Curated annotation (Swiss-Prot):
Residues 1-65 form the HMA domain. This is Mercuric reductase. It catalyses: Hg + NADP(+) + H(+) = Hg(2+) + NADPH. It comes from the Bacteria.
Amino acid sequence: MSTLKITGMTCDSCAVHVKDALEKVPGVQSADVSYAKGSAKLAIEVGTSPDALTAAVAGLGYRATLADAPSVSTPGGLLDKMRDLLGRNDKTGSSGALHIAVIGSGGAAMAAALKAVEQGARVTLIERGTIGGTCVNVGCVPSKIMIRAAHIAHLRRESPFDGGIAATTPTIQRTALLAQQQARVDELRHAKYEGILEGNPAITVLHGSARFKDNRNLIVQLNDGGERVVAFDRCLIATGASPAVPPIPGLKDTPYWTSTEALVSETIPKRLAVIGSSVVALELAQAFARLGAKVTILARSTLFFREDPAIGEAVTAAFRMEGIEVREHTQASQVAYINGVRDGEFVLTTAHGELRADKLLVATGRAPNTRKLALDATGVTLTPQGAIVIDPGMRTSVEHIYAAGDCTDQPQFVYVAAAAGTRAAINMTGGDAALNLTAMPAVVFTDPQVATVGYSEAEAHHDGIKTDSRTLTLDNVPRALANFDTRGFIKLVVEEGSGRLIGVQAVAPEAGELIQTAALAIRNRMTVQELADQLFPYLTMVEGLKLAAQTFNKDVKQLSCCAG
């Protein structure tokens, strides 16, 4: 008999559920689970996976750990088998716990490390730079703070209520805004990353650069000097991505910005040129424009060219209304930088003439941070772009090496990374979890915002799905009318015949606040009629989803306010 200690059970019914789960694990002959004792006595076959046992319990929301090892004379003892599987103490430490190496400290890495510890593993987390990764330090958090500040500046300068509230030209104190922004970044980094790691004795943090020696060992070049070899039972690669820089002649010899430098700039340039039409490019372009810069965007195609064409058209129109110059189908063939008496000047050569600017932001996408990992020593498969190829369980081509987040071929969103990290940890500790991205919401924080989930019409047709779609302009949404801001639309894509909702695209102020409702509707396979029949609070933007659903069989212009 082997014993598991179980915490988290609250009644005898919990014990029944745990018993059922354990007896479904291959190799378990019987399980006697006691809520009062907080334990499970197991009759198991030799070779039964201890990871599978703890994962089965964890899947119910409880925590299981192995009790003391049985006597040496007992053949097939669970802890003995575990040590045989995982190696001796020189590899896993005196605790005998599964040892997981995590490379990185961003959203995927943190989620994985914490979940792995919860599952009973011991973690070594390796970070070459600042703890926290891209999102909190140089991505989501500082950019959204800057975007919000720019939005406030814009409203003071211009709003739909200028007839009754006098507009004014705001004074922008960029250094003060930057100090406020970075203080919040520091606060969140400590509260959500550094402090959590420091307080968890099962996680060891190494500050240095990791590379693979082989598929069982890492070499860590420590930041304070020296090297350390880290042997592991499982490894998670969560190294994120960095700004990609296009091979434009002359560009590398200039002091161009990526988003990293732009977010911590102490000044707002008079003239800003932006190469790229990525999400980052568009969000920062509008923010800088609202803070006082004259902004010109060079887009290789159109804005949002991969999305429904109406999205790009709506955002382009909004940008041009604010004085942002959008040059579509325009690329820089040469970039030069001319040093002046005080400040230099960028000169961009295009097929349509020269563009001169005080600063240049290059935001053409992000490339996975995999080049310096020596992955050729492991056999891990990469895409031609250097992204790690993974399956829905975050497994790479090497059985015990996993990957999650922006360094993989998954969508580059921090919430996707965190969800992937959690599932990777479950799988590394013997579980079987997959990440389903069929109803993944995405938001672009321009104004109006862009929010999407599920299929666009073109994507559905590409996959052989016949569709029926409706588009509701915001002049039919009471909240937008009350705001005196009817820019944008909500579009629903429905599977023809079944009436099932399969996609939503929205361009609207605060569109991000409505898209999760759409995601839940898609995930739960709701029909458009079922969505139309739901109760939505009046004078909210999300009510637009109901109204858009009603357009499939009604003329909403003929409905009274909040008509059900």
